[in-house]
Amino acid sequence: MILVIDTSSPSSSVIATIDDDRMAETFSTGRGLDLEQLRHLARTEQITKVAVASGPGSFTGLRAGVSFGLGLAMGLRVPIVPLPTLDLQAARSDEPVTAVADAGRGRFYFLVPGGTVALGEPSGIPTAYPLVGRVANKGAPLVGAGHRFKPETELRRFVEAAAKILETAREVPYGSLEIEYMQTFSASRK
């Protein structure tokens, strides 16, 4: 079983499991991980790989998720795989979308199709594509700036997006896992 942990959002976290015949996901609101659920999974399931959202995202959130995931992978001697947060969001759609993540202070990290990660105010994010992402306040500043979110009913589940990304994602040595924090990420400003 592959365990996927995403704590990149300052307002929620996701724990997903991918097995040969089943996929499951659990969302938690607020900061932090559901440590009881993670401990239960570690005790009762044969974890063969751990994947963690690597940002950009919340400093505290990313550290918690990546630290737990890395410690678990090392303890179980299984591979660790970083999954860029915005790639995970973009993979939820078959159609081109702009992936977004909170960057704090009214700004957002975003990734347009074929582009690189950038940082900007809502008015600086291109409106050519619908948005996908877990953001605070239901994305009110983005909607107020003329953006539209792709409806959840038209998106694949987080766990399905993670499975899609994992098809080509590369495992990294334990000491080489890099986290891309809010405001320290090398995004270009738009």
Locate the predicted segments by residue.
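DPxDG-like acidic metal-binding loop motif
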Residues: K49-P79
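Helix-rich "cap/lid" substructures immediately adjacent to catalytic or cofactor-binding pockets
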Residues: A24-K49
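Oxyanion-binding and handling regions
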Residues: M1-D21, G30-G32, E36, V81-K190
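Alpha-helical context
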Residues: T26-S28, T48, L62-V66, F158, ...
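Short glycine-rich phosphate-binding loop at a beta-alpha junction
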Residues: Q46-G55, Y129-N137
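A short glycine/serine-rich beta->alpha loop
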Residues: E25-S28, S54-F59, F149
